[in-house]
C-alpha cells in the first residue's frame, strides 16, 4: 500500500470498511481460496507449479442451428404444465404397459421386475429411501 493510502486510513474515524479481507479479519471458517479449484501446487520454495491435468476443461456442444436462446425474459408467462407427481410419472412410464398386460391376462404381481420395480436397493449409489443419519 502506498503512503497516501496509509495516511488517509489513519485520518478516517471508525471501522476500516475498505480494507482488504484477510484470514485474520474473518471468522475461523473463513478460507480465502474457497470456491475455486486448484490447478497446481506450491513447492517447498514457494513456487507455484501448474499441472495441466488439474486445469478444468469445459466441453461445449456444437450449437449451430439451435433455435433456443440462452436468456429467458422475466416477462415470460408462467408455465401451464402441471407439476410432475408420482402418479403422473407412473401413468406415463409404466401404467400403459401394466394396463395392456391386465387386458391380455398376463399380469402377475410377483413379476414386477419386468416393469422396473426393484425389491431391494442394495449396491445402489443413490438410494431412494436412505436411512436417517445422525447429524
Curated annotation (Swiss-Prot):
GO molecular-function term, one example from the UniProt record: structural constituent of ribosome
Which UniProt key words apply to this protein?
Apoptosis, Cell cycle, Mitochondrion, Ribonucleoprotein, Ribosomal protein, Transit peptide
Q: Name one GO biological process term.
A: translation
Q: Where is the transit peptide?
A: 1-13
Location(s), subcellular: Mitochondrion
Q: Name one cellular component (GO) term.
A: mitochondrial large ribosomal subunit
What Pfam families has UniProt attached to this entry? MRP-L27
Function of the protein: Component of the mitochondrial ribosome large subunit. Also involved in apoptosis and cell cycle.
Q: Which family does it belong to?
A: Belongs to the mitochondrion-specific ribosomal protein mL41 family.
Subunit field text: Component of the mitochondrial ribosome large subunit (39S) which comprises a 16S rRNA and about 50 distinct proteins.
Q: Supply the name of the protein.
A: Large ribosomal subunit protein mL41B
Amino acid at each position: 500500500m502506498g503512503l497516501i493510502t496509509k495516511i488517509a486510513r489513519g485520518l478516517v474515524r471508525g471501522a476500516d470498511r475498505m480494507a482488504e479481507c484477510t484470514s485474520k479479519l474473518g471468522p475461523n471458517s473463513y478460507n480465502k481460496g474457497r470456491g475455486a479449484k486448484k490447478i497446481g501446487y506450491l513447492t517447498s520454495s514457494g513456487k507455484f507449479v501448474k499441472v495441466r491435468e488439474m486445469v478444468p476443461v469445459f466441453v461445449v456442444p456444437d450449437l449451430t442451428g439451435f433455435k433456443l436462446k440462452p436468456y429467458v425474459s422475466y416477462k415470460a408467462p408462467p408455465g401451464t404444465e402441471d407439476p410432475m407427481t408420482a402418479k403422473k410419472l407412473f401413468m406415463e412410464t409404466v401404467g400403459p404397459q401394466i394396463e395392456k398386460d391386465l387386458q391380455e391376462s398376463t399380469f402377475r404381481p410377483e413379476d414386477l421386475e419386468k416393469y422396473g420395480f426393484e425389491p431391494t436397493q442394495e449396491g445402489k449409489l443413490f438410494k431412494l429411501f436412505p436411512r436417517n443419519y445422525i447429524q
